Amino acid sequence: MKHLLVSLLALLTATAAFAQQAAPSCCAKPAPDALVAFASLAADPAFMSGHDAPLPLDYQEAGKLVTYPTPDSSTAHAYQVGPGTKDGKYLLVIHEWWGLNDYIKREADRLAASLPGVTVLAVDLYDGKLATTAEEASRLVQAVDNNRAKNILRGALTRAGAKAQVATLGWCFGGGWSLQAAMLAGKQAVGCVMYYGMPEKDVAKLKTLNTDVLGLFATQDQGISPAVVKQFQADMKKAGKQLTVHSFNAVHAFANPSNPKYDAKAATQANTIALNYLLKKFRLKA
């Protein structure tokens, strides 16, 4: 009887130990949501103070405003420059936190002029809303319905065509969404440019990427900090995906089209790197 009790006690102890070891795998915390993380960052007064309001811009559009259906039985708006050929080459541009303003349209024009034959589609994740102050921009970021934003991007990908070659590009708010758009694009994706956007933190999601990523970051960025970039590099390595990082001795938003105090030297260098990357991805000559 005594031996039986000892055996039962040993069995119970082993079972408890196994349960403790197994618990972390079933109860592990999910990776922090990158979109939620950026929305929280956008509410930080220090982050807000680093974004000066855009100045008035006298600008003549080279493209046109278009609408297209989205999977949620709604309609989305975008600014389009280029041929608009179904199943052609497309660059999806995602605006910074101010919205799809004239500065973004002008940047879309510049990119289209530098990428012959490529349709540049600057999507509007705010559904027509624009911010003119950091406070307004912060509220718009926090009010974004991420499911709606993804449907806007899905609609744009459908507009491009199932066989289209699609690259994505965005700054700040749009930088993070550029990565999200590349993941949504699946086999359509041929490139992704992130200007200091919030990286995806879920390695399982990063594994769905069908393209490499070009990341342009700032060493003095207190939000998308060097530590955040380092973790992104580690996560991409775990996912088995290629990430090329260029870091500039500048602050956040140094290349934002709407930034009245943008760093001309760093922005020019970053834009040149981005353009050369896109030329290669679309197999175009400089």
PLM region spans:
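Bacterial N-terminal signal peptides
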Residues: 6-16
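C-terminal catalytic histidine-bearing segment of alpha/beta-hydrolase fold enzymes
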Residues: 26-27, 239-286
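Acidic catalytic loop of the alpha/beta-hydrolase fold
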Residues: 220-224
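Short beta-strand/loop motif that positions the catalytic acidic residue
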Residues: 209, 215-217
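Short alpha-helix in the alpha/beta-hydrolase fold that links the catalytic acid
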Residues: 107, 225-235
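Primarily recognizes the serine-hydrolase "nucleophile elbow" in alpha/beta-hydrolase
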Residues: 155-208
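Boundary at the C-terminal end of the N-terminal hydrophobic targeting segment
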Residues: 17-21
